[in-house]
Amino acid sequence: DPSRTPGGSSGGSSAAVSAGMVPFCTASDGGGSIRTPAAFTGLVGLRASYGRIPTFGDTHLAQNAVVGSLTTTVADTALLLDVMAGPDPRD
């Protein structure tokens, strides 16, 4: 429906996950870029706490942004968090 938007800077990614084009996507959120698209497209959006998922080397992130994911199920979100999370002394 071209009259609607998937919202946020991760809107294209959330549209792809919602349409079944990809099983999940990673994203960053500093002002709703995970949460808004998840709400608009019926996905599970995780905006992890700062430091939960390392951000070292991700130079495009704003200082207040954190990494997270968009998936279709809570189980997929938990699996992805297990893969992505962990301490990084460079953060």
Region locations from a protein language model:
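Flexible, glycine/charged-enriched surface loops at secondary-structure junctions
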Residues: 90-91
